[in-house]
């Protein structure tokens, strides 16, 4: 018996030659195809020796230089709105030392095959302007000549140039430039624009050996190196606190003293807590600007400050101690910002300040109050600068103003004044000692927080504290949310029934910063100038004085006072009729009425009181006699007919005769309460000036009774 061995696939002991052929074809198709890979120039790879075939010796030939391709990326930072310049691609490309002084010196020829020009915007959304750019493929233009291609400063953009556009098809000697890109901005010099990011791809061939300069004499023995000075690192982190007093959300608030603020202090690897001195940079009856002092050791420092301004309040009494009960909003005035200032001999330079703010939604409601009059929720800032301290000194940080008026009060209302704790935001101050040859001064601008808007920020440090004066002379809106229920600032109960009704101690101060009565006079008119009092006024006592800091009359009062001058040309009835005819909404009508009131109020800047009437010669003579020869003593001459009646010898008995009213008394009756108090105070210090002012005073014209009752019906 013989045995048969079958090799291959067997199915039930039966050979399958057709299947074997199919598998053989599949193996051939799955064989790995050879792949050619290009390697970077360097040490040649070791090859395996082939066996078999032609084993003759290898052919020898002249070695050829191998080409390579490299990619370089460089940036042009800190571009302003009006910056200009150019990029010359070749050995003149100083913005990319790795290309100019590095690989370009190792090859005879090069060509740039592509250029990617990107403009990265760092400007705010409200910035304007653009940066124009132009390609010069032959390096023959020295200034920008075409403004066709532009990058918008707020948006940024990118442009790619291929080899045929930048003269990159042919090879260039490594000592000549290939092309040039010129650019120029038309924005403002004070606005930050952004930066350029340039990516180039370079092909190189024919390497060469650069021996460099001849070596000099052998160096002396290297001295023992001195240990490098340690760069100190200091940081302050904390939330300043302030105690305020508030009563109702439609009332003003009272601020306490700032005092010392407790903050975390970090120096190198150690940390603890320290007290930071703080006080008010400026203060008025409507606002107060806080400031904080930070110590600076002797040396040169790079300083970074991050401020996140937010002013929540919390209760100080049980059982809700520490729980938030509202907030104090910020004003939208341009004079409210974070900034720094010099103190104790330090010098600040290279200041960069970016302030942002977040507005409140008009429908946002906190303690039954809305954000419909420009109130702000947050005010943030990032500040960086260099500070040099010849000796141990300090600088100060100034924050946005704390508003005292009811317009910015969003706290819970109580029946009486209660203490509240108010936070003034998170402050982080980092001081990094700046040594020569180090990069500790390099800082990157932090993008604004989501929902924040950039605002105009100062470029110079703040001056010295101004004390009890406004921080800026810019007028600030002071209207209240509910003027009918909110008393004016610094108003006491003096002169009311609670104080006995006495008005003798009332003192009127017209203007917040008025130093003398001359501030109330009008230049260019014949109105008399009241001389200042000979004695300084007594200090104001709380509860016995009343200060008028602002007078903002309404449109109705102005129209009743001078209907001819303050007439806007159309009445409220005309507005209502026009709204109905135009099928407008109630909101449209209200906005038109508000616009009409603004037009009336704007006319106050051009309104001047009427000039006083000419004084008759008789009155002038009477005044001169009264000044030079006052009547003193003496008796009236008795007439011969006195006591003799023309109807017999009867006489009057009982009763008293009514005294005749004098001219001075009649003039006093025309004065308002404020004018009468002014006159009485002046009379105590200078009676002659008070009498002169009284006789030259012209009372305002009487308002028609019909007009007073119906001011919008016109005169009859």
Curated annotation (Swiss-Prot):
Residue numbers spanned by region Readthrough domain (RTD): 210-716
**Molecular function terms from GO:** structural molecule activity
**Bias type Basic and acidic residues, positions:** 459-474
- Segments carrying the region annotation (Disordered) are 1-69, 207-228, 438-547
Q: Which InterPro entries match?
A: Luteo_coat, PLrV_ORF5, Viral_coat
Concerning Pfam families, the annotation shows: Luteo_coat, PLRV_ORF5
Keyword set for this entry?
Capsid protein, Host cell junction, Host periplasm, RNA suppression of termination, Virion
Q: Where is this region: Involved in the efficient long distance movement of the virus and the periplasmic subcellular location?
A: 694-698
What positions are marked as the site Cleavage?
A: 443-444
Q: According to the UniProt entry, which residue ranges have a biased composition of type Pro residues?
A: 214-226
| Residue stretches of biased makeup (Basic residues) | 17-30, 44-61
List compositional bias (Low complexity) regions by residue number. Answer: 1-16
- Point to the regions of Polar residues compositional bias: 475-506
Q: Which GO terms describe its cellular component?
A: host cell periplasmic space; host cell plasmodesma; viral capsid
Q: Which family does it belong to?
A: Belongs to the luteoviruses readthrough protein family.
Identification of the protein by name: Readthrough protein P3-RTD
Organism in which the protein naturally occurs: Potato leafroll virus (strain Potato/Netherlands/Wageningen/1989)
